[in-house]
């Protein structure tokens, strides 16, 4: 319970706090090419770590304390218990992220709604909602990794590597001509880039190659998360606690 409050509180504080600060520091003309929800992205890039940590702790903390035995004794259907955890976590994470991003977006729209900001439509709000769902998927992936690893620190380390290492690894691979193709692929398909694209902050591409579509970024994470969740069901059903 305490970890839930701290992680969700950190998420809200980062997204809303950093976002409102960014809104104040921008001018109306800055939003001619940016969506009103763009300032929320600055805090969300760090706040997504709070979602990842909460996803891991939702399942791994019970393994660490031994409470998972009590849980499975009270509710012998392990798959139903795991499903309930996924649903509750996913709902809470999505609502918290969406409300935080929406608050910052509305704040920006109120302060910078003049003609200098240019036209804005529902598409940018839909993109922000997709970005919030993207972060929620990262949390669900973290929860699946926590169920597989059963160790909080190890699962968090794995997820931090998944989120932060691809841009670094891709840049290193781009140095050598032999691996530049792989490096460009890694730089185009990773969590930070996907989040930026969904929020409508476009990139110019890597090495002359066009960036993948928003749907491609979302589909990749959906497939990876689905595979990890499926593996977690198989492992939790067969493995002793």
Please annotate each region the language model reported.
Residues 2-4, 78, 152, 241:
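Membrane-helix interface/capping residues of multi-pass secondary transporters
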Residues 3-56, 82-150, 170, 174-177, ...:
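Secretory targeting signals
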Residues 11-15, 89, 160-164, 225-226:
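Residue-level recognition of pore/gate-forming positions within transmembrane alpha-helices
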Residues 20, 152-189:
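Transmembrane helix segments
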Residues 52-74, 78-79, 86:
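Transmembrane helix boundary and interhelical loop/hinge segments in multi-pass membrane proteins
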Residues 184-201:
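Long, glycine/tryptophan/cysteine-rich extracytoplasmic
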Residues 219-241:
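Junction motif at the cytosolic side of a transmembrane helix
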């Amino acid at each position: 319970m305490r970890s839930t409050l701290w992680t969700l509180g950190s998420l809200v504080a980062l997204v809303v706090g950093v976002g409102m600060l960014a809104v104040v520091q921008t001018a109306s003309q800055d939003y001619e090419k940016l969506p009103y929800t763009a300032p929320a992205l600055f805090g969300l890039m760090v706040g997504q770590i709070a979602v990842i940590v909460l996803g891991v702790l939702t399942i791994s903390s019970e393994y660490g304390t031994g409470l998972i035995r009590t849980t499975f004794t009270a509710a012998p259907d392990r798959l139903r218990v795991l499903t309930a955890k996924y649903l509750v976590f996913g709902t809470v994470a999505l609502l918290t992220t969406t409300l935080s991003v929406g608050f910052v977006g509305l704040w920006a729209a109120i302060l910078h709604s003049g003609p200098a900001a240019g036209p804005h439509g529902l598409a940018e709000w839909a993109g922000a909602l997709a970005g919030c769902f993207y972060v929620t998927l990262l949390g669900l992936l973290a929860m699946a990794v926590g169920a597989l690893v059963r160790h909080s620190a190890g699962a968090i380390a794995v997820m931090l590597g998944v989120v932060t290492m691809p841009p670094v690894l891709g840049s290193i691979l781009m140095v050598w001509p032999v691996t530049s193709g792989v490096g460009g692929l890694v730089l185009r398909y990773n969590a930070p880039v996907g989040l930026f694209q969904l929020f409508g902050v476009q990139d110019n591409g890597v090495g002359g190659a066009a960036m993948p579509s928003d749907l491609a970024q979302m589909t990749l994470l959906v497939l990876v998360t689905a595979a990890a969740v499926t593996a977690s069901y198989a492992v939790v059903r067969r493995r002793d606690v």
